[in-house]
């Protein structure tokens, strides 16, 4: 196997893992693979040849060594490395396949064309108010142009979690972390059952074909004990990093959920409604309407507050108050005229009725004059 393939494989694993995962990969390569290959070869190369028993019985040493070490330390650690890296390699293969498939045009989902947004035109109210003889549509469509996509910002450095989430690999990544934890715990328990925490300097063997109780002696027991404890520490450290990585992903996911929720609430926060000017009647509209009522013989009902809708300045309000007093007088005279109309028909041409008509004409003239002044002020 060429080293270039191994280097490319490690690069891909590093690109599709978080910051904690990269630390785990560094410790795994240095303290497990390199330490097992370099240290194990020099320490355990003569473990069976230097295993000496005080007997000359053929086959007794082999049987006693098998009882002392059912599985060699180095072979156990090599098997541990293979099984622990298996979930990571499977995850990497799945990630590369999915990314390559997403880049393929045949498997890429077809994006639907976005429907144009329809909004009520801002000039709709003015068009309805126009009397140009044209029928205005019930709904005026105003196509809102789509916002141009902003150019992507320069890639911000992050811990790799966003890239994993963007590629849709988060579930598979967490699954391989859980598998790694299970394997780590299983191998730690098996290592304790097989070897304990110390390599004994001697071993008492009573197996057949040994003729009697045989004492056997192990080469470099202290060095092997130190190396065994180092491997325990490395396994515990890798297990802690894996658990820390899962906690990191969980807390980061919760934090992103809260941020997304806060952003969603800020977007949906109700805005202050835009005030629109309520259209009002022209200044002389109510007066003309009252004149029509008088011509039809209906009893006039003057809206004493109509002046407030048309004029807003102080001078016009004083004029309106003065005219309102005249209107009250005119109303009283009109009531008397209607009450006595049947008994004396000629009463309608009396000076009182003429005075009422004069007052009404003065009111109409004042309102029209004031309305023309307001219109000139608006145009100016």
UniProtKB/Swiss-Prot annotation:
Keywords: Cell junction, Cell membrane, Gap junction, Membrane, Transmembrane, Transmembrane helix. The keyword Repressor does not apply. It comes from the Eukaryota. The chain crosses the membrane at residues 23-45, 76-95, 172-194, 229-251. InterPro entries: Connexin, Connexin_CCC, Connexin_CS, Connexin_N, Connexin_N_sf. Residues 1-22, 96-171, 252-380 are cytoplasmic. GO terms for cellular component: connexin complex. Residues 46-75, 195-228 are extracellular. Residues 337-380 are annotated as: Disordered. The keyword Transcription does not apply. Residues 342-353 have a biased composition (Low complexity). Pfam families: Connexin (PF00029). Residues 370-380 have a biased composition (Basic and acidic residues). It is a multi-pass membrane protein. Its main location: membrane. Residues 354-369 have a biased composition (Polar residues). One of its GO terms (molecular function) is gap junction channel activity. GO terms for biological process: cell-cell signaling. It is found in: Cell membrane; Cell junction, Gap junction. Gene3D superfamilies: Gap junction channel protein cysteine-rich domain (1.20.1440.80). One gap junction consists of a cluster of closely packed pairs of transmembrane channels, the connexons, through which materials of low MW diffuse from one cell to a neighboring cell. Participates in a developmental pathway for formation of the notochord and tail. A connexon is composed of a hexamer of connexins. PANTHER family: CONNEXIN, GAP JUNCTION PROTEIN. Belongs to the connexin family. Gamma-type subfamily. This is Gap junction gamma-1 protein. It comes from Danio rerio. The lineage of its organism: Eukaryota, Metazoa, Chordata, Craniata, Vertebrata. The gene is gjc1.
């Amino acid at each position: 196997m060429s080293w270039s393939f191994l280097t490319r494989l490690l690069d891909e694993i590093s690109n599709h893992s978080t910051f904690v995962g990269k630390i785990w990969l560094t410790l795994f390569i240095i303290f497990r693979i390199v330490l097992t290959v370099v240290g194990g070869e020099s320490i355990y190369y003569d473990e069976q040849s230097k295993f000496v028993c005080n007997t000359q019985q053929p086959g007794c040493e082999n049987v006693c060594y098998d009882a002392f070490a059912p599985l060699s330390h180095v072979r156990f650690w090599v098997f541990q490395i293979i099984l622990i890296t298996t979930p990571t390699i499977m995850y990497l293969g799945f990630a590369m396949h999915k990314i390559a498939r997403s880049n393929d045009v045949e498997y890429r989902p077809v994006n639907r064309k976005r429907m144009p947004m329809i909004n009520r035109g801002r000039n709709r109210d003015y068009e309805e108010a126009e009397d140009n003889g044209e029928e205005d549509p019930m709904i005026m469509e105003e196509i809102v142009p789509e916002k141009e996509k902003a150019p992507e910002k320069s890639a911000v450095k992050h811990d790799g979690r966003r890239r994993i989430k963007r590629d849709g690999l988060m579930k598979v990544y967490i699954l391989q972390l859980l598998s790694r934890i299970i394997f780590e715990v299983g191998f730690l328990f098996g290592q304790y059952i097989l070897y304990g925490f110390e390599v004994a300097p001697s071993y008492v063997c009573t197996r057949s074909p040994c003729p009697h109780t045989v004492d056997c002696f192990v080469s470099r027991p202290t060095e092997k004990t130190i190396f065994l404890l180092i491997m325990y520490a490395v396994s515990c450290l890798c297990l802690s990093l894996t658990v820390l990585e899962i906690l990191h992903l969980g807390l980061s996911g919760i934090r992103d959920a809260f941020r997304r929720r806060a952003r969603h609430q800020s977007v949906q926060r109700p805005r202050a409604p835009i005030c629109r000017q309520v259209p009002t009647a022209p200044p002389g509209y109510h007066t003309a309407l009252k004149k029509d009522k008088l011509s039809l013989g209906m009893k006039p009902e003057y809206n004493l507050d109509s002046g407030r809708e048309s004029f807003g300045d102080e001078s016009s309000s004083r004029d309106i108050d003065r005219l309102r007093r005249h209107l009250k007088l005119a109303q009283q005279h009109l009531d008397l005229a209607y009450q006595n109309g049947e008994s004396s028909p000629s009463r309608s041409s009396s000076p009182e009725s003429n005075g009422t008509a004069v007052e009404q004409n003065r009111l109409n003239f004042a309102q029209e004059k004031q309305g023309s002044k307001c219109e000139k002020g608006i145009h100016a």
